[in-house]
């Protein structure tokens, strides 16, 4: 396909001007983690602008500590009747760690439940005129261009209709390494420019080297263009945001000169598989309870989840530059889970970090299958465990350290739960197979009886289950109380049925995820790096043999644990069955939950429905229509051969190549770049050059105007007569 064959691309001039605006370089230096930088923390502009209420911390964190101390005391009392053995001490220690983890979530849930009972409304700032400039950033890495560019198209158009569009510029920041996807991005950008250039300023840049992944992508933008803008609104490749939410974030940031970062709580949408629908439903019913409670008590010491948030550019560039950690990955090198760290550093510098739990209209998508969730969690697990290197950073607020610690525990809790199960099983087997030593070596007139307080143990079990499922219960109570909310998910009866189904299916999946997280932690401790692979976002299906291979150890672990339990008694096996059944049938669970067809069956039945699915926001419907249109626009992908052949297409491509200077003369040349230079130089024609270039090398050529010009000068094909005439 040539340029002239596409009505959208009838000109060699890039519609709307340059692919990127003129640079305005600014400094974003890596922060020193071993000492507090000079001038930090800054003085707040408004009196008490970054001060939080201690009473809220006391109620939630203090309540969690008191609840944990009570539970630990009760567990100790269960064992103390006959004297506590070393194995029982281990059970007590593991129980203490795990209970503290769920107690904090429970107390946050209580706070969120009480707030949501009052149905708080978002602060209305619609009348505020925006005099600040915001760059809306959409980083992408080997994603489907139709998804990314159609979302930007719809959001830009709806934002332009608010009267505030002049205050925003849009940037698609590509780190794509696949040459085919890179060319599709350029095709999609041309369509996007054609649609939006009259009402919005939309830009595109693909980095030559994706150093430091997403954090490096955003940092590169800040150093080159960040000084042009007051704020950065960071999205993800699957993000959508209503125009009222975008303007609301900018207005809140403008109204609060001490705000460094404002994070929304995104709703999950567009789930097509059963697994995605399960996550959507749980996040919609129970998520607001935890999110609202968290935002209420952390106050000005909130967190950043990497996207769907607005950041003050000054705060980000002066305080959140990420250093490289000493050593090699997985614990050294670039900071992977950058978001938590950036929020902590911004707060350290004296800016507030707020979770806007009252602001709706923020959306994202979720992994479609257990395997896709495992791939994502492997990367997140490495990043969160890496935070153990960040915890000692000088000057961090204790709540920021708590965010880092809870992120670490999100994955370490699985090994702790597994160890608790194993030690409890060992206690049962010990009591069954090992004869008690009633009289020890120490002189005593009375024997040592291996007994436990069974009534207290059962009571503690019920308390633990109440704490564990408390946030779910709070979410269900809010659902039942709010008739409008209940109707939006299909009515109270279907909602209750969906809750029961979600609890059962989640209970089956939980032990699988526990072993997945245990495996991730183990591989990280063994020094294995996760790498960076693009995410699947739609169909989660996989061949059965692949699933058997991926879940083989989970099934084996379930069989071994079941065998150990039955050695003691059928009663113990029955008690452990909720955790074992999921492991035994891990493969069919993984297959069924990753199926779009099964997801569609549940959608038609109205099970696991959410308000966003039954009555989607207008922007979600527009995004679906726009994506279908973009798929048609780029149905005939460009190729590098076409770019070299068509001069007009070449000029359009070069107009979208990053203008960052190439390697300066005299500086060392990287191995791959040298190899590409040799291949291009030795090629007799374009066809032979393309035949010897691999995909990574093609991506490099696409980003290098000099190499492209060299290839363009070559004949399209090599003809023997050319060699004769040359001789």
UniProtKB/Swiss-Prot annotation:
Involved in the biosynthesis of osmoregulated periplasmic glucans (OPGs). Its EC number is 2.4.1.-. One of its GO terms (biological process) is glucan biosynthetic process. The keyword Ion transport does not apply. This is Glucans biosynthesis glucosyltransferase H. Residues 18-38 are annotated as: Disordered. GO terms for molecular function: hexosyltransferase activity. It comes from the Bacteria. It is found in: Cell inner membrane. PANTHER family: CELLULOSE SYNTHASE CATALYTIC SUBUNIT A [UDP-FORMING], GLUCANS BIOSYNTHESIS GLUCOSYLTRANSFERASE H. It comes from Shewanella baltica (strain OS223). InterPro entries: Glucans_biosynth_gluTrFase_H (IPR023725), Glyco_trans_2-like (IPR001173), Glycosyltr_2/OpgH_subfam (IPR050321), Nucleotide-diphossugar_trans (IPR029044). Belongs to the glycosyltransferase 2 family. OpgH subfamily. SUPFAM superfamilies: Nucleotide-diphospho-sugar transferases. Keywords: Cell inner membrane, Cell membrane, Glycosyltransferase, Membrane, Transferase, Transmembrane, Transmembrane helix. Its main location: membrane. It is a multi-pass membrane protein. The chain crosses the membrane at residues 58-78, 97-117, 278-298, 408-428, 460-480, 496-516, 572-592. The gene is opgH. GO terms for cellular component: plasma membrane. It is an enzyme of class 2 (transferase). Pathway: Glycan metabolism; osmoregulated periplasmic glucan (OPG) biosynthesis.
